Amino acid sequence: MYKILRLIQENQQITSHDDLENVLNGLNNLIGHEFFLFGLSFQPTLKTSETLVTDNYPNSWRQQYDESGFMHIDPIVKYSITNFLPIRWDDAKRVNNDGRVIFEEARCNGLKAGFSIPIHGLRGEFGMISFATSDTKSYDLNQQSIHTSQLIVPLLAHNIGNITRYHKDAKPRAVLTAREVQCLAWAAEGKSAWEIATIINTSERTVKFHFSNACKKLGATNRYQAITKAILGGYINPYL
């Protein structure tokens, strides 16, 4: 217990991809598994999604998984969308025939046993952390391994924003000024450019200038799309 608590304490802020790998490797070693995978899916827009993966899975399996489109029928992925509790792979195999096929192919690539834990963010992000082994003869999946792994989930969930920003495969994040964010936030409340100008004590022309800059930075064609992207990207927090 001391080791996992120390791992969490030393990695409160994940500010690089190396930090993320260190946490995953550390936990993987603590629970005595060979392989780990952290996958995270999020929506930069309402119609598009991005997936970030950090793992040490065999390259042969990752290539087959991606080329075969297994993510769309993977029972672990489907489970993680709407659940929070861990799931053993042995239990997931029984879900449907697609699941049995995927796990059989995984076994052929050295991933013979394991478990996964769903992870959810505040803005609809979802993902999972999985641990696996190729040695089923001496593999004893006890509840302690699962419980230990669950302790890391709040840390990963807390750092989802940093992970999407600093992951090795992440796209560059737009940097908005305080005024641009302020204008978008008021626009999200239904205020016109003239009303926003009155509220923040500036000219309507200046407000439109901020809208134009925000749209360019966010890759939006108009202020309404910019508002959507700003909310999904965490620039505007609708809960505050």
From Swiss-Prot:
Keywords: Activator, DNA-binding, Quorum sensing, Transcription, Transcription regulation. One of its GO terms (biological process) is lactone biosynthetic process. Disulfide bonds: none annotated. PROSITE patterns: HTH_LUXR_2. Probable transcriptional activator. Binds to autoinducer molecule ODHL. This is Transcriptional activator protein VanR. It comes from the Bacteria. The keyword Mitochondrion does not apply. It comes from Vibrio anguillarum (Listonella anguillarum). Belongs to the autoinducer-regulated transcriptional regulatory protein family. InterPro entries: Sig_transdc_resp-reg_C-effctor, TF_LuxR_autoind-bd_dom, TF_LuxR_autoind-bd_dom_sf, Tscrpt_reg_LuxR_C, WH-like_DNA-bd_sf. GO terms for molecular function: DNA binding. SMART domains: HTH_LUXR. Residues 169-234 form the HTH luxR-type domain. PANTHER family: DNA-BINDING TRANSCRIPTIONAL ACTIVATOR DEVR_DOSR (PTHR44688:SF16). Residues 193-212 bind DNA.
